Amino acid sequence: MSAKKPMALVILDGYGYREDNQDNAIANAKTPVLDGLIANQPNTLISASGLDVGLPDGQMGNSEVGHTNIGAGRVVYQDLTRITKSIADGEFGQTEALVNAVDKAVKVDKAVHIMGLMSPGGVHSHEDHIYAAVEMAAARGAEKIYLHAFLDGRDTPPRSAENTLARFQELFAKLGKGRVASLIGRYYAMDRDNNWDRVQESYDLLTQAKAEFTFDTAVAGLEAAYARDENDEFVKATEIKAEGEESAVIVDGDAVIFMNYRADRAREITRAFVPDFDGFARNVFPAIDFVMLTQYAADIPLLCAFPPASLENTYGEWLSKEGKTQLRISETEKYAHVTFFFNGGKEDEFEGEERQLVASPKVATYDLQPEMSAPELTEKLVAAIKGGKYDAIVCNFPNCDMVGHTGVYDAAVKAVESLDECLGKVVEAIKEADGQLLITADHGNAEMMVNPETGGIHTAHTNLPVPLIYVGNKDVEFKEGGKLSDLAPTMLSLSGIDIPVEMSGDVIVK
């Protein structure tokens, strides 16, 4: 059997294009390989944000959204827009799972706990949704409404939570009931890399009020964290209660609503509330009604307010139906993105699909190791390309995003330079295998390391375009105006495979 000539897609997570070189880790890095590709290979810029990926106009893209759109080959209406629309239409307050959980707690005079990432960032959650959930609980008669605030500082400026917390303090004052009950940074509450010691700190705060600090108000707790030099993301467990108030812990009979809609960083803390769990020893395990805003994983047996819409004939599924073989490969931080999200929210492999996982380094923050596990990932990717086993390969390099999120400029430059070295080996392997390669990104990040308006560190994604570069055995010219959802139909076309009718994206090669 002759060796296959693979179609490889390499996604440089967080690698956006920005004309201004100021504080631009991508433009200022030494990248001879990428420079040569841009000079000599077909390339263009494509959109990875806003309406083009099913988000509100102007909203920055993110990894979940990006990979879902790439894999689907069509613009996918995202959870953010779907839930926002349900609030505007008045349907949110009638959502069965939410209504049932709140009503059950109210009936027996129990508390409604609402937790989630308190941020206007729109990547994992949106504070407007949390606001609507508080209003809904109050409207249905809940007297004890406790808000557990996970703080952002990653998809938002590092110290930007005060306005959000003040907004909710005003809401509770207006309602005359409820309060912010706890604060903790997303570093602890939203881990996704099996750092169970961090997750346990969040769980113990929620269920036992186990906290290093206690303050009368959320804003006071936040100000104290800043005084300790903790940015929003890293705020340590803080209980919020005034003198004479009881701790607002989760106990038997309560309702818990988790208002994050993005799955990957919601799973670990959610699993801690499921009976079958071995991440850490739980001192208490309350019998509660727990509602996930969206489905975080198919094997989590909890209520879900907005079940996933089914996506048929994604790139991976279509390749499988066509009898093709495919490989998905990344390191831990983005493994879910090239598998679960790329497959339209489906956990299981398709027939003919294989997966390889490279462990992300165990460091506190990735500025400490900006190359992450890229060398090992590259070694495996090159072997897969040369091995002749796969018709299609999808690989994600997380570096520009994960290091970009730290806000450490010099580390981000090193991340880009390490990727460039790796790409040289990948390009060489593709040419040797007489295959085809598309290099792109799911969203921007490392091209803006300082906020040009405030002068502060910029740790969030951007809404800037991303590159698309072709390397291969075909004479290719790109059309202008492409977007992420055009990649799957374009790859199928370049591979000589029919495009399923469900893929409404355009073929952007002439």
From Swiss-Prot:
Query: Active site: which residues?
Result: S63 (phosphoserine intermediate)
Molecular-function GO terms, alphabetical: manganese ion binding; phosphoglycerate mutase activity
Pathway given in the UniProt record: Carbohydrate degradation; glycolysis; pyruvate from D-glyceraldehyde 3-phosphate: step 3/5
InterPro entries documented for this protein:
Alkaline_phosphatase_core_sf, BPG-indep_PGM_N, Metalloenzyme, PGAM_B_sf, Pgm_bpd_ind
Pfam families listed in its UniProt record: iPGM_N, Metalloenzyme
Q: Which HAMAP family match?
A: GpmI (MF_01038)
Provide the function of this protein: Catalyzes the interconversion of 2-phosphoglycerate and 3-phosphoglycerate.
Q: How does it assemble?
A: Monomer.
Q: Which PANTHER family match?
A: 2,3-BISPHOSPHOGLYCERATE-INDEPENDENT PHOSPHOGLYCERATE MUTASE (PTHR31637:SF0)
User: What is the name of the protein in this document?
Assistant: 2,3-bisphosphoglycerate-independent phosphoglycerate mutase
What is the species listed in this Swiss-Prot or TrEMBL entry?
Answer: Vibrio atlanticus (strain LGP32)
User: Which gene name belongs to this protein?
Assistant: gpmI
